[in-house]
Amino acid sequence: MEYMSTGSDNKEEIDLLIKHLNVSDVIDIMENLYASEEPAVYEPSLMTMCQDSNQNDERSKSLLLSGQEVPWLSSVRYGTVEDLLAFANHISNTAKHFYGQRPQESGILLNMVITPQNGRYQIDSDVLLIPWKLTYRNIGSDFIPRGAFGKVYLAQDIKTKKRMACKLIPVDQFKPSDVEIQACFRHENIAELYGAVLWGETVHLFMEAGEGGSVLEKLESCGPMREFEIIWVTKHVLKGLDFLHSKKVIHHDIKPSNIVFMSTKAVLVDFGLSVQMTEDVYFPKDLRGTEIYMSPEVILCRGHSTKADIYSLGATLIHMQTGTPPWVKRYPRSAYPSYLYIIHKQAPPLEDIADDCSPGMRELIEASLERNPNHRPRAADLLKHEALNPPREDQPRCQSLDSALLERKRLLSRKELELPENIADSSCTGSTEESEMLKRQRSLYIDLGALAGYFNLVRGPPTLEYG
C-alpha cells in the first residue's frame, strides 16, 4: 500500500537511476543507516547484565547437549528483576528443541504469593490452572482476559490460595519484552508480574488477576458503558499511562481487552509490544498494535512517540461509549478487511462519537484523537480535564466496597442517634412494622446489601446499585 506518490516529470530520472544502482552498495548503505540491533530499553546496568547472559548462550547450549545442568534452567527459585530478565534472555535466545526433554520446570519468581517446593513448581500439585473459557461469564467466577499472543488461564497457588492470571506463550514465540516492562516498572495501574516458569516448551507468566475481567468483556456482556463508568476507567488508565510515559515507555496496544478490572481499580495488561524510547521519537521496524485503535503516525511508520497511546485511548473511549470500535459501523469488516488505509486518509473518527456524549467528554475524545501528535495532550494533561473531574454532587457514590460499607455505616449511625432506647416499644416507634424495619436497618442485612453490590462491582466498573 502506497502513502506517497512521485510526480510523473521525475519518473524517467528515477527509472534511469534504478538501472545504474548497484544493489550491494545500497545494502551496505542501509546497514550503516539502520543498525540491526534494537535500541537499548533499560539502564546500562540492566542491559549489561542481559548482554553478559547472551554471551554465555553457546556455553549453555553445549551444557544442555551434554546433559549437564544450566544455572538458569535447574530449578524454580525466587530472584531479582535482573535474574528474571537474564532468564528471559536466555530462553529466548536458545533453540526450543533444547527444552523439549527437560526433566523438570525452571523459572524465576518475584513474589512470594507463589510457593515452589524444593525447587519445583508443578501443575496440579503446586498450582491449579483452569482454562479461561470455564470462567468466562460465569457469575461465580473470576473473569480472565484472553491475551493477544498467548492463552490466559486462571491460576491458584495451592499453598497460599492466591489467584493469578497465567499467560502461556510457546517458547519459540516468547520474547524478553513479554516480561521486561512489567518486571522493571511497578505501578498500581499496571498488572504486577509475579514470575515466569518454563514447563517443557511453554513459558508460563504469572501475574495479577483481573477480578472483574476486561473492558471488552464488560462491553460484550452488558453493552455500552455509562459515562460515569467511562470516567472511572479512563482516570485509572491515564494514571498508568502517565507513569509509563514518564519512563518513555510506549504501551503500543491500548484497547478494551488490555484494560482489566480489579475490585477497586483498572489496570493495564499485555506489554508484549511495549518499548522504552531512547530518543524523543521511536522509529519502529514493523507495525505495533491493533490496527483499529492505531494512530495515523503509527501506520505511516515514520516515527512516533508516547502520544500514540493517547490516540489509542481516544479510540477506546468511542468503543466504550458505543459498544462498537470506531470505523466499524461505517466501514463493515466484511467489506474492509483492513482499516490501515482508512485511518491514514480519514482519521480521526469523530463521526463515531456517541450522540448522547456530554460536551466535556466529546472535547476530551476530540483532543485525544487529534491527528497531529504534537497537538495531542499528554496523559498528565488529560487527567486534569474537566470531563474527568465533574462536580462532587454529580459523582456517583460507587468507588469501592469499602466506600459502600462506610456509607452504610454512616447512615446507620445517623439513624441510631434518632432511635429511642427501646425500639420495641410501639408507643415510641409507632407501628410494629416500623419497628421491624428499624431492627433490620441495625442488623447485618444492610451490609449484605453492600456485599451484593460488590459482586456487581467485581464483574465490571462500579455501579450505582448497592443492594
Swiss-Prot record:
Positions annotated to bind ATP: I144, P145, R146, G147, A148, F149, G150, K151, V152, K167
Protein keywords: ATP-binding, Cell cycle, Cytoplasm, Immunity, Kinase, Magnesium, Metal-binding, Nucleotide-binding, Phosphoprotein, Proto-oncogene, Serine/threonine-protein kinase, Transferase
Record Pfam families: Pkinase
The molecular function terms of the Gene Ontology recorded here are: ATP binding; magnesium ion binding; MAP kinase kinase kinase activity; protein serine kinase activity; protein serine/threonine kinase activity
Instruction: Extract the InterPro entries matched here.
Output: Kinase-like_dom_sf, MAP_kinase_kinase_kinase, MAPKKK8, Prot_kinase_dom, Ser/Thr_kinase_AS
Which CDD domains did the record assign? STKc_MAP3K8
Q: Which residues carry this modification: Phosphothreonine?
A: T80, T290
Q: In which tissues is it expressed?
A: Expressed in several normal tissues and human tumor-derived cell lines.
Q: Which PANTHER family match?
A: MAP KINASE KINASE KINASE SSK2-RELATED-RELATED, MITOGEN-ACTIVATED PROTEIN KINASE KINASE KINASE 8
What is the name attached to this protein's record? Mitogen-activated protein kinase kinase kinase 8
The organism is Homo sapiens
Q: Which gene encodes it?
A: MAP3K8
